[in-house]
């Protein structure tokens, strides 16, 4: 809860600054920061673009459907059922897909590595597929594990250049 409140306060602070143009508000992060970027964009409609590299905290309910959840894998299964049903119910509200489903207007770039075993691609896709914004793109990197990958930077730089070009 505190993490999400801090996101909102940080965005409120940025929007209160006299040097903010009143139009452009981009959130960007990787892994847990990617989860925070999706949450920030979902919680604040003033966000104009979101970049999430291998976002964490996606698809917490995956084990209930026999899939692997993304980090941190809150739901433990026991005998085909959640070991703690209260945890299974609660984490749905802290799932990046829950926040992603609220991103209506922001331009979105999501990146995933196909050999990432921390934030598995299926969990990233669960969040990406929840985004209703018409301007969304996912880029797959078949060779990428979790963490920094040089091509992430190239794709991100191109996306940002398109967002920040004069006249946009």
Where are these regions (language model features)?
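Short beta-strand/loop motif that positions the catalytic acidic residue
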Residues: 103-104, 109-112
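Conserved alpha/beta-hydrolase "acid-adjacent" motif
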Residues: 117-123
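Alpha/beta-hydrolase fold nucleophile elbow
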Residues: 19-31
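Active-site nucleophile elbow and catalytic-triad environment of alpha/beta-hydrolase enzymes
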Residues: 84-100
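Alpha/beta-hydrolase active-site loop
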Residues: 1-18
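Hydrolase active-site cap/lid region
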Residues: 38-83, 140, 148-151
